[in-house]
Every structure is written in C-alpha cells, then in structure tokens.
Amino acid sequence: MSLMNTDLHSSLKKYFGFSKFKGLQEGVIQNILSDNDTFVIMPTGGGKSLCYQLPAIMKEGTAIVVSPLIALMKNQVDAIRGISEQHGIAHVLNSSLTKTEVKQVKEDITNGVTKLLYVAPESLTKEENVEFLKKVKLSFVAVDEAHCISEWGHDFRPEYRNLRGIINRLGDNIPIIGLTATATPKVQEDIIKNLGMTDAKVFKASFNRPNLFYEVRPKTKDVDADIIRFVKQNQGKSGIIYCLSRKRVEELAQVLQVNGVSAVPYHAGFDAKTRSKYQDMFLMEEVDVVVATIAFGMGIDKPDVRFVIHHDIP
C-alpha cells in the first residue's frame, strides 16, 4: 500500500469512522488529491459526498462546494461539524446569513480553519464574495448536483451555467469536481463541456440497486385510507410521500396527523426557516413521514428511508 493509500485509509477512519472505501470512492479521491479535474456519476446512496469531503479535509486551503439547495448545504455542514472539534471546519455562505455571521465565515477561511465552504451558485456571482475568495487559498471547486448545469437535465438551473467563468476569476488552474446521480450521456457531455473539463477523469458507478423494488398499486377513491393503512403497517419507519400540488401536500399531511401518523408537509411555498425546521424534524427522527412536492429530497442524506410513495403520477 502506497503512502497516499495509507494516509487515505487512516484519514477515512479518523474523520468518518469507516475502515474501507465504498465502490469507486478511493480512485475518485486519489484523482482529486492529485489536483486533477474529476467527473463522478454515482447513484444516490453511492457515497458521492465523501468523495470531496475527505480530500477537502486532507488538502491545504478551502474547497468550495456549489450546491443548489439551502437544505442540502445545511445537512452536510451539520454532518461535517459533527466529526470535528473545529466548528468552523465547514460553513455555508448564502443570503440568509447576518453581517456578523458572514464576518465569522470569512475569518475562519482566512485563518485556514474552514475546509469546506458550501455556496449556492447565486452567492458566487456576488462581486464581494468573488473578490474575497480570490485572495484566499482554494483547494478545489466541487459542483454537486452537476446535472443542474444542463438544459437537457430534469432540474436545469440557469445560474449553474455561469460557474466556469466565475471559477476562472477565482484563480488559475483550480481543479474542478463535477458530481451527479442522474445524467444521461447527453447531459454528461453538456456538463463536461460547460465546466470546461474535457480532460477530466470520469468515474461512473453501476446504477443497479438490488435493495430497491418498485410496486404499482391501483389508485382507488379511498387513496388516503390506503396510504394511512400502508404507513401504519410500517409504523416507526421513515418515508416520503410525493404529491404534485402544494395544496394536496398540506391536505394529506393533515389527514395523516389526524389519524395518528407523525407527519409534516414540505414545499417551496414555505419560508426557508419553516422548510429547515421540517427537514430537521425528519432527519432527527421527530417525525416519521414527510409529505412533499419535488422541492424536497435532492441530496437529503438519511440512510433509513424505507418507503417512497408517489401519490400522483410524476
């Protein structure tokens, strides 16, 4: 085992408590530690986050992680802070922070405390943030949920397409890591082209998930009663129920609550504080079920979700 491998395995054990890597993780991390551009395509649950978290902790400087959702960023920052004595090891930089909080974030980055800085793409377009980040040592930029770049993807975000130009402004030869769980060949090509990483090493994991199975049931006029029955048969297990409309989300969550199921609603119509509260309740096992629109779910790291119900055809 080479010195890099020895360091890698001891760091994996030290920071994350794992004795071995999963799937392609080790090769991905070695490529990142060698300062190469890297493109990672892994299914949900494949361990994508660790692919940039571990090298960020090991490398000198701060890694920028571009993420589309405040909920996702908060989830990951909390997890990283949980493995370190340094509260400032990971930070979010977004519009919800007060001036005092922004000052603290910048101090921690300048002092070399912060290893992971999570930002929404909009935050990177702010001139004051660009000017600040130009002056500090950056280890790499990781673009999570990279399919948001592609107009051919299912979750296109226009602000993602400006990332390459901004990264160029932050410094020369900053390695770029693109990560996604959902990319057709056309979307993959678009991501690589848009991020200007044609020399990137591509790591693509198998998408076969033998632990998952699908079931299609007839939707009766008593669908609410059917869902209540199913959830009660799986009492105490975590689950997500997706609905097409916000109105239906709130109605169904209320019906579940009235029938003794611990459930919360979640959709983009709630303010950030409420969304964050409901997400935390689900992650911390305070409720069993989230009834949601597609605003919920991207990047949520909860290892024990046991069922997902689609109330309406997506």
Task: Please provide the spans of the model-predicted regions.
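Helicase motor core with emphasis on the C-terminal RecA-like subdomain
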Residues: T6, S10-Y15, S19-G23, G27-F39, ...
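Basic/polar N-terminal segments that are highly enriched at the extreme N-terminus
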Residues: M1-M4
